[in-house]
Amino acid sequence: MTLAQQTVGLFSNLPESYNGYTLFNSLGSTNTYLIDNCGVKVYEWNSNFKPAASVYLLENGNLLKTSQLDSTTFSFGGTGGGIEILDPNSNVIWSYEVNSDSTLAHHDLEILPNGNILILAIELISAQEADTCGSLSYTDSSGTVFSADRYSEMILEVNPTTDQIVWEWHAWDHLIQDTDSNLLYYGTISEHPGRININYAFDGTDPDWLHANSIDYNADLDQIIINSPTFNEFWILDHSTTTAEAADSIGGFSGNGGDILYRWGDPQAYNRGDTLDQVFEFQHDAHWIPSGLPDQGKIMIFNNGNQRGYSSIDIIEPPLDTNNSNNYILTNNSTPYGPLNLYWSYSDSINFYSPFISGAQQLENGNILICSGAQGKIFEIEYQTDSVVWDYIIPMVGPNPIAQGTTPPPMGNICFRAHRFSPSYSGFNNLVLTPSTVIELNPLPSNCQIYISGCTDSLACNYDPLATINDSSCVYPVIWQQAFVICTGDSVVVGSNTYNTAGNYTDTLNAVNGCDSIIYTNISITPPAIWQQSYSICDGDSIVVGSNVYNTAGNYTDTLTLSNGCDSIVYTNIVVDDNTSSYDTLSIIPNINLYWNGIPVSVSGDYSVTLINSVGCDSIANLNLTITNTTGILNINNTERTLVKITNMLGQETPYRKNIPLFYIYDDGTVEKRMVIE
């Protein structure tokens, strides 16, 4: 049996390829396919309409797609007119039309986080209105001067629950022209980079003047990218505006209304460059690289290169100014927007060229999935090496699959875009993915293997028996030892267990990586410190213990915190000693040099001095001094009381003496302290 030479289907699937499911459709077919990395069909949707261009698999498993409806007014590549959502059984659960004599949906759309849908559409601008806005007149081959109609771009945001347009933007509101100062939108083009030159990229023959072919939304910035291949630029717009602000040049978070916030690809479009500055040539699929991917936040473009004759995938890093309301840095009034150079680019001038349609996607491992639409080819390159690691030719001509060995005719299997999803994508939860057969007829025998990255070590706790490629993700049980010294009454939490007594404990926990983690814990208890202290203080003094102040006698208990964090119980006993005082009476004869408590006294009167007694408290000594010329004991006896005896300081009876203190004790109980000095 002679096998056909391979012409379609899967050509290669290397281990370096990112495993997943690839969504695509052929523009000549009403079917949309989901295939695995071996090219085997795992799901299929059927519609009554060919796609205008793009299709999207939503997070709930429904398919959002553009629809190609009949139009009697408009005819250009990417015409649509309809949008529909198909459930997993291909039932139409929602549809919407932008298809009239003056408007038409085309090419692309974008679903927003709130469920609303951004729709790319054109609106017909009459030649008369274009003339009032500064559009140039044109001369045909016969010499006839004429004006031309225009197709201008607009974006409609539709709520699919109500079918209401809740926001819109019109390119025609943001024009600039420098041909006639008496007409609308006159100005210096280079001074208005936020506006669209009405006379750029238009020769009067093709009214599809802007031909936007893709739209993307960045929820973090609340900004929109639309792509104009005829201008060789993509434009970024502010979506935070109201519809009224979107028609103006003020408003929104950026403060610039609906004017272009940033543009890149060919600064000739706003008179700030020349042919050497042009990078893009009829490019497609300008979009932000999503969060979580290696080049998140950068912008990826399929640069068709229809002038140079080869295509490239380009990535740029836009000069976003987060400190200036998410506007973009423009150095001065004469230079174009940066960057000056591409961040990254891939091309293969021999094997890779699509002069129209097409797109690209960065995958989770950094690889790039490329849909070379005109070739009907979907392939994947390894990001770091540019090596082709997956290669597939769409086996369709128009609406029908073709047999292996049949070469698709030029443009017979064109594809607008392809997208690969991780096997864990939420949209698959509502789909039954059943590998069936490849799409092509009479397929060749295949030994294709699905390469699944994961842990291939059976000893690891995240061992994946389906994994065929060890991706160094294996994780193993962790043994952890820890020791704690805690205070009485405190505790240690290990997993769901709480320990508050001394000892050794073993716990098995489940880590975030899916492995068991064995924890050995030793706990020691530090009891509270007990401290006893006693103080004898004087009346009026105080003792500070922690934050408390004590100035009365008694027993007190305080709980303090030590430097190790544990409690210290302090018992304090306080004795309050009274301050003392004494009163002396003294009679001396004149001319005696007398010192009393260090103080010279020689004049009759009262004296006082504060001393420190034996317990350290104040002792106030008072002296009444009398200077007399009489010697001896005065008034020992009187009619009111009788002297009983005289004692010294030791209580011993003593005869009358001079120059020593004596105590005179009377029968009425009174005692006088006297000293006669001569």
Which role does the model predict for each range below?
Residues 3-452:
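Histidine-/acidic-rich catalytic cores in large beta-rich domains
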Residues 36-37, 630-678:
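C-terminal outer-membrane/trafficking sorting elements
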Residues 460, 467, 496, 515, ...:
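Terminal processing/anchoring signals of secreted or surface-associated proteins
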Residues 475, 522-526, 573-577, 624-630, ...:
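Short beta-strand edge segments in extracellular beta-sheet folds
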Residues 488, 497-514, 539, 548-565, ...:
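Solvent-exposed segments in extracellular or luminal domains encompassing
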